[in-house]
Amino acid sequence: MNIPSGTFSRSDHFHASSDASLFSSSLPLIQHQNINPRDSYHQSVDEMASGLDHFSGGIGNMLDDGDSHPIGNMLPDDEEELFSGLMDDLNLSSLPATLDDLEDYDLFGSGGGLELETDPYDSLNKGFSRMGFADSNVDNVMPQNIFQNGVGSIAGEHPYGEHPSRTLFVRNINSNVEDSELQALFEQYGHIRTLYTACKQRGFVMVSYNDIRASRAAMRALQGKLLKKRKLDIHFSIPKDNPSEKDVNQGTLVVFNLAPSVSNRDLENIFGVYGEIKEIRETPNKRHHKFVEFFDVRSADAALKALNRTEIAGKRIKLEHSRPGGARRNMMLQMNPELEQDDSYSYLNHVESPLASSPIGNWRNSPIDHPLQSFSKSPIFGNLSPTKNIRYPEFSMKTASVNNDQEGRRFSHLDHLFSSSSYNNASHKASTFQQPQSFGSVSSFGSLNSHPSHVETLSGSEFLWGSPSSSAWPVNPFSSNRENHRFPYSAQNGSLHQLHHIGSAPSGFFPRSPETSSMGSVAFRGASGNMNAQRNLRETSSPNFKMLSAPRRSQLFTGNGSYLWPAATMVSIDDPLEDGSNQQFDSNGNQADIKIQFQLDLSKIMRGEDPRTTLMIKNIPNKYTRNMLLAAIDEKNSGTYDFLYLPIDFKNKCNVGYAFINMVSPKFTIALYEAFNGKKWDKFNSEKVASLAYARIQGKAALIAHFQNSSLMNEDRRCQPIVFDGSESKYPIIRENSQLEASNSTVSHPLVGENTHQS
């Protein structure tokens, strides 16, 4: 039986298997199968039809010799019968079945409203289709858009992907669950701003936190957990293309009209007073605008109220809340460059960067294999890995991908924010902080030696508390012959007594090494060609790029019995000033001048010349608990201290090798020094030798202010700092809203429970 050309209608090819496009065959596949719209290998109807027309002539001759009747019986006689089974093969189960379902689908689906989390491996496929090349070397290839956040994220954005937010969309909720149960369940991870339960009968609720770290912690801990015999399905919820006023990203502030001389560290000093800063970001080609992102929305609100319309470096700044949507903005600009003329649209639609959701440390040590592991073994791309050449697996550096339209390529800006001191209003009246104009943009690198791919780094805790490694300090401290500019922000922002610093020991942050002053290194292949760190890392091969101290200045008294000591600052010798003059250095200083800053001088203490009371106890065995440390201290120093904090590595469930203690008076420092410094520890047969140094944050009040809004207050109370009320009794006095304050009672707070320790 001959089959004439054209008998195979184009519509009938919907029933052909998609595998037909993968294998050559003399006969088409006629077997009926369901349509798979997600099959990435299916061909268009026109392509398949043209191919079948090409083979139709030969098919007739081949069928003459064989059994043609079964095939003839399968063909329909008329056109209606040909289309009759088409709809039967379509899977309509995903469409809403009721009016209520239709409303939910409209609110949370792809048509608008809130964007739900997508599968990370789904996003991986999309990301690879947008692969870009940073330079001509294949080894240096990095995807521009890789993964979504919330599941082992890395730097990079997907235009329509999900980013961590402070609001969680919780599905599969049992309608019998009480609101109080939900409140108690989610409140253990942080203060809840709003709990929306009006749609609980439909199976979902919305939980909004003030702190983005709380929402991420809740998602990690509760994802898939059973609640009333139902597994929770949790997603981040963020506004889509046209956010309303209530969807404004309250945690990120846009700073307009900045002077070019104001660096990220300057902004950190100014804005960090109001809360912990997650990130400070720059905008390509517009250095007079920057984004300051806080972990907590309340901190951003406080900074907005206090600093809006104030002057920094002689220019009046303007602050506004940022809006999500910057990733979509970049794509729209490529299609319509005229949008670039609208500055307000550009900066009010800046998306939250997914950088902070990147896991701390190296992916190779992660319990979850990252999806690029298999991709990096490709024979085409070679050894591709985002953690390639990272030699310090416990320290993760923030990197942000910034699209430079003029140069047509993507640069990696290393913008890790490190801790710096903050000052209150009273201190500025007596001594205003001076910052040389030549500092430019500051980063948290240590000494960059002559090797082009080697960068030494200080861990965040060392920046926070001081006591750096000697290898991080230069031969000569920094000084400048230029006129220094001042930042007159203290006159407008009222009382700035709360001292906040970046970082509060997230999981896996602290190194496993018992020696906390050890230095790690991060290497970048071809770094000099495709890496910028603010303005200072243009040439990483320069041997003159050093970690330098700020200009010599005495300790600053904050007005509340606390002292602040100057922090280290990194500048580039090779980076000229804007007017062409170069930086100069004082040759009279040496490395010892910097290190002595945090060393204890018993003679000065005995003469009353050193008022500092907060100490860092280093080289503590990692198995020591807080109670063990308290017992060791109380053997000879009971009642001489009023604050103790033993940082915990939550990943490894042990301490990180050091602790911080505040003595009631400087005179008690000598006894503690004699009891511990240079001595071995009694327990666990440890060979570690204890050593003492001064901490950077000084004074009980400053320590309490630092931890007031820290996410550490959401952790187990055994991991939190404790404040004592003198020699009579000792209690942890952490209260609601994650605040510390000294206890003046011999009864423990009801939120804490029984006494932790008594003398």
Curated annotation (Swiss-Prot):
<feature type="domain" description="RRM 1">
    <location>
        <begin position="166"/>
        <end position="239"/>
    </location>
</feature>
<dbReference type="InterPro" id="IPR034454">
    <property type="entry name" value="MEI2-like_RRM3"/>
</dbReference>
<dbReference type="Pfam" id="PF00076">
    <property type="entry name" value="RRM_1"/>
</dbReference>
<dbReference type="InterPro" id="IPR035979">
    <property type="entry name" value="RBD_domain_sf"/>
</dbReference>
<keyword id="KW-0694">RNA-binding</keyword>
<dbReference type="GO" id="GO:0051321">
    <property type="term" value="P:meiotic cell cycle"/>
</dbReference>
<dbReference type="InterPro" id="IPR007201">
    <property type="entry name" value="Mei2-like_Rrm_C"/>
</dbReference>
<dbReference type="InterPro" id="IPR000504">
    <property type="entry name" value="RRM_dom"/>
</dbReference>
<protein>
    <recommendedName>
        <fullName>Protein MEI2-like 3</fullName>
    </recommendedName>
</protein>
<feature type="domain" description="RRM 2">
    <location>
        <begin position="251"/>
        <end position="324"/>
    </location>
</feature>
<dbReference type="GO" id="GO:0003723">
    <property type="term" value="F:RNA binding"/>
</dbReference>
<dbReference type="InterPro" id="IPR012677">
    <property type="entry name" value="Nucleotide-bd_a/b_plait_sf"/>
</dbReference>
<dbReference type="InterPro" id="IPR034453">
    <property type="entry name" value="MEI2-like_RRM1"/>
</dbReference>
<dbReference type="GO" id="GO:0045927">
    <property type="term" value="P:positive regulation of growth"/>
</dbReference>
<dbReference type="GO" id="GO:0005634">
    <property type="term" value="C:nucleus"/>
</dbReference>
<comment type="function">
    <text>Probable RNA-binding protein that plays a role in meiosis and vegetative growth.</text>
</comment>
<dbReference type="GO" id="GO:0045836">
    <property type="term" value="P:positive regulation of meiotic nuclear division"/>
</dbReference>
<keyword id="KW-0677">Repeat</keyword>
<dbReference type="Pfam" id="PF04059">
    <property type="entry name" value="RRM_2"/>
</dbReference>
<keyword id="KW-0469">Meiosis</keyword>
